[in-house]
Amino acid sequence: MNNTIFDDVFRTMIEKMPYLAVPLINEVFHTSYPEDVKIVQLRNEHQQEDGEIITDSCLLIGKKMYHIECQSTDDTTMVIRMIEYDFAIGIEHAEKQGRRYRIEFPKSCVLFLRSSGNTPDHLEADVVFPDGNTYVYSIPTVKMVDYTKDSIFEKNLLMLLPFYPMCRKTPCFSYGDIRRVHRIYASN
């Protein structure tokens, strides 16, 4: 597995401070969970015959699963990896109903730390089933470039702060900004 420092930072935040993901989930999926909602961290390691796949995050809020991947650059194969990850998550949490199974994919998104004009708002793939039915697998993307430091604070997307400097060419935080973050974290 090729981890980047960004993967490590993202996974550590999810593991140690999962409540930071709630505003991001609300932003992306148009939900309105309170910041103190109960969050269950699901396994992010999934065994497959050809090896283990590791996702960045898999969270359960209420009865909904959420899967967020952090990507440092726009990778055109990401949609295929997301289908693989989501299928592994769905299989692991499949519900047996008599002789039939219900496999539900999590609500997923990709956080692109760097993106270009070609980075889509949704990653999509056509999935053709044996009966000929085609379903569009579509997941939203979150692009750091779309957020200013002010919008990060206004929307309480503090999870994005460690990644903000990498998508800016000029210094982006003042001493006052750092004190503001310290006050927010100290109050939690």
Residue ranges and their predicted role:
Residues M1-N188:
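Elongated, amphipathic alpha-helical interaction scaffolds
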